[in-house]
């Protein structure tokens, strides 16, 4: 493989983690955006998206040399738009060169025409020219020596300066030169069959593929497969305590929604997503005196909170750019990714120092990926999924599971006290997502067992109410048990926790078990029951509607 030197202004293909190569240009980074430590990388601005990121040199390839093979790999609409943007850029640059070339040619033609008109034609003039030619040559020779000597001195100084600024020298390359070289492969290996096939880049001998630095964002993630992301490059930036796995928590003595002793942070708070959980959270933040800017995909949901004193954000990017800490609570991994990486998304508003807290219940791969792209822009990231339901959200009695930037966790103290009774810090990003899925796996399986017990009581001629009374007097007694049984007995399945979401969490928990080769047969069985309930059009009802899967 040949080593190819890259420099400022070069057009390149940037490879970011699992995503397809994307065309971009090496540019100077903003003054307030520092280069990541320990990484040999360039700052690249991507065509078609106007996004940018620090990218390792191993993940960069020259644009022209690899254009054909990259186009064969990716046929997506956005990708083609990006390539078109590059070609338009090249056409404009070429047009400027041609204009400059034409101007020079015109000047040359005018000079030649002038010389032609003044050229001597008679024999006498030719002889005079010949006689004077010797003197002219002599004088020119002397002048040439003087000019050449001065030019040589200046040229030598310029060359010396250029050599000092550039690592390209003859002989053995200096250490710095290695930072500006990338391995160039003549073939593309390991292409996948799909239109969004991942491009396999050759790693350096000293750096395995697993340490790739995936910053890529602003892409149609729904077209790609499950990510295989590594968090090692980011954990150094996140201020977390590796040894803490849940020993730290912020607790309120009682329902913090009615606890007037909370001192709200003076930071500006943003909140994205006003669903069942988000609505209660925002309401409590406002009650406790926080300054909140809200955004929701359906803007009508914002009206009530505007009346309560919240401000309206037109886009997620606007909310993030105008707030110090932005929380988000959406339904699933796809929604979480779209919110961050989509048009006018969170990433567009992230600047150094901006904070993002994702409260969605998603898988560890998704939250790790989001953390990477946020941190790559200089932002701070915390995951903080919540355990509870709509009623607990309204009452400010949620349990918050947090992981990531420890400093940001502490900065969110007053917010967490307003929205929940307890919050736990679980260490590095991904831990909270895993814990949340396990909690919901237990809850979802328990709910399916409750429904199974009630239906079994019915078909065997036993009183369902008596069964509930017995359970409420035993060790299984809980608010959750009583409420869900009451829902079933009354036939009231108004959503407190959507059935489709608990099924989603069960599916993700099963996948988590598969990833570590751990059996989850109970969760798998419960998942099948919820899937049957969804087939019976119960997705938008409460999770207790799983009962109907047993009676149909």
Curated annotation (Swiss-Prot):
GO terms for biological process: transcription elongation-coupled chromatin remodeling; transcription initiation-coupled chromatin remodeling. CDD domains: PWWP_GLYR1 (cd05836). Residues 213-216 are annotated as: Interaction with histone H3. Residues 91-187 are annotated as: Disordered. Residues 91-145, 161-181 have a biased composition (Basic and acidic residues). Residues 215-224 are annotated as: Interaction with KDM1B. Disulfide bonds: none annotated. The record marks 216 as: Required to promote KDM1B demethylase activity toward histone H3K4me1 and H3K4me2. Residues 260-552 are annotated as: Dehydrogenase domain. PANTHER family: CYTOKINE-LIKE NUCLEAR FACTOR N-PAC (PTHR43580:SF2), OXIDOREDUCTASE GLYR1-RELATED (PTHR43580). This is Cytokine-like nuclear factor N-PAC. It comes from Rattus norvegicus (Rat).
